């Protein structure tokens, strides 16, 4: 008898009953395959943006350095003192107080003028380009005014217009070659080809010839070539400023034909017989004789003043001068334009009250004209032009007064001192709209004094007469005691009274002494 074979049933997952009335249904759970994973959507790559990192300036807690280390006297005058006035032959005041225990000053010979480093760089590049070994010289421009007749003025005005047209057409040609791309990058290969005045001259030959033929008497071809060269050089400088980050957006604008100041550039070969371009202008009256001109000259016309001025570059020969070993510190401010401190004397130059009184009438007229322009917007074009010309006239009067003071003061300082340490005043942040602490009247005073222009003129005069000018940061110069180094918040007080050493002095003179000490530090670098 055969044995029964046991059949083993496979295991089935648990059953679930769903009751629907009387009937029952069995539902079996079956394992489902997991759904196929979809590939992730490709997102557009984000452009990597450079994070702007703020520069952390590690400023020292104290700027004090002992007087012994710099071999400076402790002397500083008290606030109550009698000044002696210096003759200025101008509208401003210049007062001086001498040290009673004055020490003798040593003298030495120095060869002047000193060529500035930027000028040395440019002259070396010119020597490399022209393959010459010309000596490096100090170049300064001389102003010569010319007095053309009415017929000569008409010819010159057409020449100014043609020069501007040639300049604009050459800039349009360079822009068409797409030197700067839309992304902001610079096409270096295109710049080498395009920003070359010879290649631009060849491309714009027909335009140049048509412009020359359009006038009678015709303008010289070399003057038109100078316009092309000027456009190329301006384009290059704009590119370098954009690369170095000095300007945020690259934008070189064409000249408007009706602009205030118009120029033409004239080669030295056209100057003959006390005139230029003798075939067109056989006789030309001038304030100085037009002789010994060996460099390119620019002729400028100002429509407001109606003056024709030639800017002639001249080489100043070197000579030796006896200089005194005497250094000073200068604190620019709002009470006095400049406060000067040296071991033998202190000076206060031009109190702010005198500046207000001298520019009072000009600013009254400026405010009156501005009110007329604001209250009456529907003025005629002729009336508007007249008012704007009046505004420029009174602004020019103020700038001329400041210019006179700047040059006379800088000339006197440069001749008395061999090293000048001047405080670097950040006028831009003070005059900004964000600064609500200062009133508009104070901001106007600061703008009229124009400290930045004064430092520029002082440095130029320093190179000319062999005086070193150092710009010093004014950080903690007013708060620090120049004798012991204690820091104190002064607020609005005009006098610095130290509690630790008992020094009693004017706050501006104390700051000027600190500026001098910081400038004389051996490790200090000009920033």
From Swiss-Prot:
Region (Disordered): 21-50
Cited InterPro entries: Cas12f1-like_TNB (IPR010095), Recombinase/Transposase-rel (IPR051491), Transposase (IPR001959), Transposase_put_HTH (IPR021027)
Annotated positions binding Zn(2+): 481, 484, 498, 501
Chaperone keyword on record: no
One Pfam assignment: OrfB_IS605
Entry's Gene Ontology BP terms: DNA recombination; transposition
Record-level Gene Ontology MF annotations: DNA binding; metal ion binding
Keywords: DNA recombination, DNA-binding, Metal-binding, Transposition, Zinc
Statement: the UniProt record of this protein carries the keyword Metal-binding: yes
Biased composition (Basic residues): 21-36
Family, as annotated: In the central section; belongs to the transposase 2 family. In the C-terminal section; belongs to the transposase 35 family.
NCBIfam families for this protein: guided_TnpB, IS200/IS605 family accessory protein TnpB-like domain
Protein's name according to its UniProt entry: TnpB-like protein R854
Organism: Acanthamoeba polyphaga mimivirus
């Amino acid at each position: 008898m055969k044995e029964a074979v046991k059949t083993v049933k496979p295991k089935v997952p648990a059953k679930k009953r769903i009751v629907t009335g009387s009937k029952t249904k069995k539902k079996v759970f079956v394992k489902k395959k997991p759904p196929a994973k979809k590939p992730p959507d490709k997102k557009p790559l984000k452009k990597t943006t450079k994070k702007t990192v703020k520069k952390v300036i590690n400023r020292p807690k104290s700027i004090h350095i002992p007087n012994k280390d710099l071999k400076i006297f402790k002397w500083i005058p008290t606030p109550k003192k009698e000044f002696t006035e210096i003759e200025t032959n101008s509208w401003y005041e210049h007062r001086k107080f001498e040290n009673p225990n004055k020490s003798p000053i040593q003298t030495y010979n120095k060869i002047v003028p000193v060529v500035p480093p930027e000028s040395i760089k440019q002259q070396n590049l010119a020597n490399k380009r022209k393959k010459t070994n010309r000596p490096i010289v100090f170049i300064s421009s001389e102003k010569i005014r010319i007095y053309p007749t009415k017929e000569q003025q008409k010819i010159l005005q057409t020449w100014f217009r043609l020069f501007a047209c040639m300049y604009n057409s050459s800039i349009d040609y360079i822009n068409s070659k797409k030197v700067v791309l839309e992304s902001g990058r610079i096409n270096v290969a295109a710049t080498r080809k395009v920003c070359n005045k010879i290649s631009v001259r060849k491309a714009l030959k027909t335009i140049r010839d048509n412009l020359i033929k359009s006038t009678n008497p015709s303008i010289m071809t070399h003057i038109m070539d100078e316009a092309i060269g000027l456009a190329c050089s301006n384009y290059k400088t704009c590119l370098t400023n954009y690369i170095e980050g000095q300007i945020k957006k690259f934008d070189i604008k064409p000249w408007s034909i009706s602009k205030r100041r118009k120029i033409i550039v004239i080669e030295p070969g056209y100057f003959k017989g006390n005139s230029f371009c003798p075939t067109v202008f056989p006789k030309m009256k001038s304030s100085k004789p037009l002789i010994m001109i060996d460099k390119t000259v620019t002729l400028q016309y100002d429509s407001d003043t109606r003056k024709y001025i030639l800017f002639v570059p001249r080489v100043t020969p070197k000579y030796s001068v006896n200089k005194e070993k005497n250094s000073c510190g200068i604190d620019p401010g709002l009470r006095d334009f400049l406060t000067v401190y040296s071991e033998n004397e202190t000076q206060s130059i031009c109190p702010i009250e005198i500046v207000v009184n001298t520019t009072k009438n000009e600013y009254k007229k400026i405010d009156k004209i501005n009110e007329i322009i604001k209250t009456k917007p529907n003025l005629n074009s002729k009336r508007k032009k007249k008012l704007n010309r009046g505004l420029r006239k009174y602004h020019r009067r103020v700038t001329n007064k400041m210019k006179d003071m700047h040059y006379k003061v800088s000339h006197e300082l440069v001749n008395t001192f061999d090293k000048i340490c001047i405080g670097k005043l950040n006028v831009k942040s003070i005059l900004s709209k964000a600064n609500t602490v200062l009133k508009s009247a104070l901001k106007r005073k600061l703008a009229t004094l124009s400290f930045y222009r004064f430092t520029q003129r002082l440095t130029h005069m320093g190179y000319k007469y062999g005086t070193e000018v150092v710009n010093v940061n004014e950080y903690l110069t007013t708060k620090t005691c120049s004798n012991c180094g204690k820091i104190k918040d002064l607020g609005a007080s005009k006098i610095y009274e130290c509690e630790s050493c008992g020094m009693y002095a004017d706050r501006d003179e104390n700051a000027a002494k600190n500026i001098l000490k910081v400038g004389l530090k051996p490790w200090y670098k000009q920033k």
